Amino acid sequence: MASYKKKLVKLSFTGALHIGAGKNDNYDHSEEIIHSDTIKSALYATYRQVYPELSQKDDGEPFFASFRVSSAFPYFGNELFFPKPLAGFIPTFSDIPAENKSEIAKKSKKIQYVGFDLFNNWVNGIQPNVQQNHLDSSGKFLFSQPHEKNVKVLTRNVQQRVYIPPQGSDAMNTQPYFIERLFFGKEAGLYFLLDCPDSEMLSRIQVCLHVLGDIGFG
């Protein structure tokens, strides 16, 4: 009988990262999460390279059906972040006077990610009561516990580049374009949840993850 295996996978990045939005990706904007289907596809492509004798026997359906993954969201140290709920998430700041509603609304609107404990409390009907030092320096990340004011989970940078046509084509038809890159803080990165009941398949997936750590997700 297969044992039940569930893992938390953390991805750390030593350099810049651009997360595309699909076939029609505009390079001047990077996503901040890696969607679950992208993670699964990257794992399958690596699985076919590492285990060709297994992957060539089928169309991939047994592989995709053997495990589940979440999308990859930001983390900082031990703090796991979830996207802020679209509705009903109403934090109060104990160090901002209640009558200063515009300031509270401004800070609340800017929040995009919520720490696990605060998110879990909200799911159970408890609205967050926090202070301004629960926010990172960008105001986008709301930590479950107070943090240093200058904490940066991630920053963005837009760089101009030039596309040069392949040799033999119209070499004069160069095209400038912009690419946005993400830089994660020293203790930050992306995480996702991996749910794989089969121990043998889990071991293979872990091997594929180590390979992806060297070659990237694409």
Question: What is the predicted function of each stretch?
Answer:
Residues 1-218:
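Conserved active-site/ligand-binding neighborhood in enzyme cores
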